[in-house]
């Protein structure tokens, strides 16, 4: 018995730091082992590609909270990973984590990769996280994709800063649930 314990302890010491880092205790507590292994494989892929992992973890935890079956959780995590990859393609390898997350959400909200790239080109200093988040919020609030994009892109072309984008969102979001915002 003592020999088994020593071998197990030695095995733990030999595990790579990357393998240990890949394990998220939140996932261990909420997912079955098969689902967790597949989600952790997606996390490892994201890390290897320099993509943020927290959106993947959050999607897995969301699925677990809703009682989704393991394969559905894995599919949802894979979709988020694919969105982050598309965001990276649209923004380039130098994109910051917050920009990738915002771009992935904007893509899910109806933006195209070319729209994301355009935003990078026209936004002062190339910072796109806030403009893309505002676009996503407007679409989620009921504004049509085209109208929301025109509003955000126009402000970007005019050199709007983050505060201006947040004011745009406040101005264009519906005043009450169910009402539809209008484009300027």
Can you name each region flagged by the protein language model?
Residues 7-15:
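Bacterial N-terminal signal peptides
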Residues 21-184:
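General marker for long, soluble alpha-helical cores
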């Amino acid at each position: 018995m003592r020999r088994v314990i020593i071998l197990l302890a030695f095995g733990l010491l030999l595990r790579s730091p990357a393998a240990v880092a890949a394990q998220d205790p939140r996932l261990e507590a909420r997912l079955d082992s098969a689902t967790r292994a597949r989600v952790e494989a997606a996390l490892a892929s994201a890390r290897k590609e320099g993509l943020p992992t927290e959106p993947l973890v959050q999607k897995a935890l969301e699925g677990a909270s809703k009682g989704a079956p393991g394969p559905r959780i894995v599919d949802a995590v894979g979709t988020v990973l694919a969105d982050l990859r598309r965001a990276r393609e649209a923004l380039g390898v130098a994109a910051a984590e917050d920009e990738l997350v915002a771009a992935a959400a904007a893509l899910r909200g109806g933006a195209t990769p070319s729209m994301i790239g355009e935003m990078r080109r026209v936004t002062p200093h190339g910072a796109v996280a806030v403009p893309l988040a505002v676009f996503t919020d407007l679409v989620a609030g009921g504004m049509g994709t085209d109208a929301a994009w025109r509003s955000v892109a126009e402000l970007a072309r005019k050199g709007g800063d983050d505060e201006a984008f947040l004011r745009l969102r406040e101005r264009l979001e519906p005043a009450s649930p169910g009402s539809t915002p209008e484009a300027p």
